[in-house]
């Protein structure tokens, strides 16, 4: 069925493709229940030098939705193939892409029949993001409107800094002061970095001496000496430490008024986090490594942390991210979004961040949104004076650069 006929039959013809008025509930309900929109093609898109991949869902009405996940893209692609070729509940071909909750539940339950998490959850996250992209295009509304509207007119970001994602070639060891001063000049209010990771790797996370501790704290002092409290500081630990070392580090950081401590321990023992949380005056962030609201439930119930952080391409997608934030809000816990993947994760995170009521920060990485994402899109969300906004276009608002999918380093694989 042609797109024009579909729009007319689904009661959206009167709105027109350029219309942005909010359609009534009956119109949306009629479209979602319509047998006329179906997934007719599933394909993956990989880039030879990228650690992330895309999933594209094509429909019989000419609308294509695009999702994303990362890393381990061979495993992610294999899961999508298995869902499509061998599964008893996960097939996408021929289904209605607007049945977002139904799709999530049947794939999640099939995956949980074997094991929950890993590549299966990453694949489900990509599927969910692609479906929401389709929903927005069908309704001719930006995604944040479908998620409840833009309660956050400006979305506050912090900047994660590593030497592999450097600004102007500056390294943390040599140029900490320049980095801090640059971020402040850009209006960015907080930095996150990993001053303790080198010691954790050397000692396997089992011990940190006072001398080693002082060496790590020097990085913090250099920021304070350069810009004072114009730049908040968050510390990332990559779950490398044991409990006694984490307590020692947390106590040592307290005089420096640190914004948060992220993933000090592995996420598989919330009672250990409860012990750490009782010892630390600094808010604990847990954890983009958790998948689905079921993974976060124990954190909330145990009182293990102060801030919930998730990654939309890992936790189950946009649907699940919204549920995690809403669940956190019942405990008066704010949420943050991890965005260390590809450009579509960045797009999706800005949309959800605009709509949730308990947003703390969204992670940003200056070289990715400022430079990398422009290699793929005409309109990647840009940080302005420390804040970002989602595109005001239907769905995710993706505007691919011309000829992107024909480039030599792009691998497009048709799954079904």
Name each region found by the language model.
Residues 5-27:
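N-terminal export signals
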Residues 21-57, 64:
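C-terminal segment of N-terminal export signals and the immediately downstream linker at the start
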Residues 62, 127, 140, 191, ...:
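Conserved, mostly hydrophobic/aromatic
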Residues 154-274:
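Metal-dependent enolase-superfamily TIM-barrel catalytic cores that perform enediolate-based chemistry
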């Amino acid at each position: 069925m042609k797109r024009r006929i579909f729009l007319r039959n689904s009661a959206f013809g009167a709105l027109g493709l350029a219309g942005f008025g909010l359609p009534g509930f009956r119109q949306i309900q009629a479209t979602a229940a319509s047998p006329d929109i179906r997934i007719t093609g599933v394909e993956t898109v990989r880039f030879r030098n990228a650690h992330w991949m895309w999933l594209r869902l094509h429909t019989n009405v000419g609308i294509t939705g695009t999702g994303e996940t990362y890393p381990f893209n061979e495993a992610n692609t294999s899961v999508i193939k298995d869902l499509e070729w061998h599964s008893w509940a996960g097939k996408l071909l021929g289904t209605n892409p607007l049945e977002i909750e139904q799709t999530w539940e049947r794939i999640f339950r099939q995956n949980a029949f074997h094991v929950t998490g890993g590549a299966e959850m990453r694949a489900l996250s990509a599927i969910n993001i692609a479906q929401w992209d389709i929903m927005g295009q069908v309704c001719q509304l930006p995604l944040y409107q479908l998620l409840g509207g833009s309660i956050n007119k400006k979305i506050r970001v912090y900047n994660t800094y590593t030497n592999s994602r450097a600004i102007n070639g500056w390294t943390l060891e040599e140029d900490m002061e320049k980095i801090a001063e640059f971020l402040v000049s850009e209006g960015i209010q907080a930095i996150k970095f990993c001053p303790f990771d080198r010691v954790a790797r050397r000692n396997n996370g089992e011990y940190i001496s006072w001398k080693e501790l002082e060496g790590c704290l020097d990085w913090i002092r250099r920021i304070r000496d350069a810009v004072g409290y114009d730049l908040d500081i968050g510390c990332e630990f990559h779950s490398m430490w044991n409990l006694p070392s984490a307590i020692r580090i947390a106590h040592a950081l307290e005089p420096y008024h640190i914004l948060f401590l992220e993933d000090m321990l592995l996420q598989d023992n919330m009672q250990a986090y409860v012990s750490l949380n009782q010892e630390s005056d600094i808010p604990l962030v847990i954890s983009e490594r958790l998948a689905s609201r079921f993974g976060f439930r124990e954190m909330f119930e145990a009182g293990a942390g102060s801030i919930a952080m998730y990654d939309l391409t890992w936790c189950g997608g946009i649907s699940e991210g919204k549920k995690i934030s809403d669940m956190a809000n019942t405990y008066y816990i704010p949420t943050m979004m991890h965005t260390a993947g590809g450009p579509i994760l960045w797009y999706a995170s800005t949309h959800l961040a605009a709509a949730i009521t308990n947003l703390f920060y969204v992670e940003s990485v200056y070289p990715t949104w400022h430079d990398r994402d422009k290699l793929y899109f005409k309109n990647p969300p840009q940080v302005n004076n420390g804040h970002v906004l989602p595109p005001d276009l239907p769905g995710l608002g993706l505007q691919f650069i011309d000829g992107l999918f024909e480039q030599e380093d792009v691998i497009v694989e048709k799954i079904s």
